[in-house]
Amino acid sequence: MATIVQCLSSCATLESQFKVLSLKGISCSSPSSSFSNRRGASATLSSSLSFSQSVSQCVAFSTGNLWVQKPMRQLIVCEAAAPTKKADSAAKRARQAEKRRVYNKSKKSEARTRMKKVLEALEGLKKKTDAQADEIVTVEKLIGEAYSAIDKAVKVKALHKNTGARRKSRLARRKKAVEIHHGWYVPDAAAAAPSEAVPMAA
């Protein structure tokens, strides 16, 4: 906006200079003065024309419209690359699900087999009349293998952790019951006897 106002004021100054030049040319009568006036007028005219030329380079007037040249702008276009990762297909998901199902089934089956061996050994030891205390060591080894199988099944999430804890507790209770049956383990009297009621103070 400031550039347009400056150009308009320069055009008005140029018009006034043209009027002064025409008046000076009419009033002068002597050859020497007319020559000097013509020389000065030509200098003024040339300076005015040079100014008007510089103005016309900046702003062009055409049929009452003001045209201002805008600077050129460079545009940078970036193309987004397509994703390289291929989407999983339904067939692939089915294969993975089947693979996990077979793996989890094997872990659960192993834990179940180990537990069955422990329970059978404890049942046979309980029915045996002349059982010795050293025979429980073999059962304890089987219990350790069963615990390991249960922990592996829980680790791969084939079994819930609470389910694994219940199964291990079941084996421990069965072992303790056999030891109590043969007299190899005597529970504490305080734990076996019911707790006596504490009399209230009068």
UniProtKB/Swiss-Prot annotation:
Pfam families, alphabetized: Ribosomal_S20p
Biological processes annotated in GO:
translation
Question: Quick one: where's region Disordered?
Answer: 89-110
Q: What happens when the gene is disrupted?
A: Embryonic lethality. Embryo development arrested at the globular stage.
Which segment of the chain is annotated as a signal peptide? none
Entry keyword Ribosomal protein: yes
* Residue range of the transit peptide in the UniProt record, numbered on this chain: 1-79
Q: What does this protein do?
A: Binds directly to 16S ribosomal RNA.
What family does the Swiss-Prot or TrEMBL record give for this protein? Answer: Belongs to the bacterial ribosomal protein bS20 family.
Query: Can you say what this protein is called?
Result: Small ribosomal subunit protein bS20c
